[in-house]
Amino acid sequence: MDLTITTLEGKDAGKVKLNEEIFGLDPRDDILQRVVRWQLARRQQGSHKAQGRGDVSRTGAKMYKQKGTGRARHHSARAPQFRGGGQAHGPVVRSHDHDLPKKVRALGLRHALSAKAKASDLIIIDDLAATEAKTKQLVSQFAKLGLENALVIGGAEIDVNFQRAASNIPNIDVLPVQGINVYDILRRGKLVLSKAAVEALEERFK
């Protein structure tokens, strides 16, 4: 698959041949869903907690005698059916993380990249560098490229001026290539890769 390389100014800078095993797969929604679900589960805090009958601050003594009152048999007022009692089967502090094989995670990333390429939402930029950290200038350049909602992936290190200029632009995320992930790719409209990012990804999936 051949794709045109552009500069930040919108000029052509040649072509690049993309690896079909990374950018030319037929995307599978089930694989993408599994990876996104795994990512969000790892991110979920899990600090929710409700007091059970063993946690509430009430006496554990029997409410009244077993027989002779004509009332229902009860033990402690901590039981869930009473006002001020503990919650039955309430949430507890836990991790929502679950396992996902490394091969499935790698496959998910390749399918996400292929999905963007197939939808013509993949743009290759020659170099992600800015002469000065000016947001206004970068917004103008992005407008020429039609980037209003995009994930921008640079090389192993992002140019400091470019990072600062892009940090104030809404709906634009900038990550180094080692931070690329399925969730961030899918949540943004366009995917922008630098030439260095393409080379790093192809090296990673060799």
UniProtKB/Swiss-Prot annotation:
The keyword Ribosomal protein applies. It comes from the Bacteria. GO terms for biological process: translation. GO terms for cellular component: ribonucleoprotein complex; ribosome. One of its GO terms (molecular function) is structural constituent of ribosome. Residues 66-77 have a biased composition (Basic residues). One of the primary rRNA binding proteins, this protein initially binds near the 5'-end of the 23S rRNA. It is important during the early stages of 50S assembly. It makes multiple contacts with different domains of the 23S rRNA in the assembled 50S subunit and ribosome. PANTHER family: 50S RIBOSOMAL PROTEIN L4, LARGE RIBOSOMAL SUBUNIT PROTEIN UL4M. This is Large ribosomal subunit protein uL4. The gene is rplD.
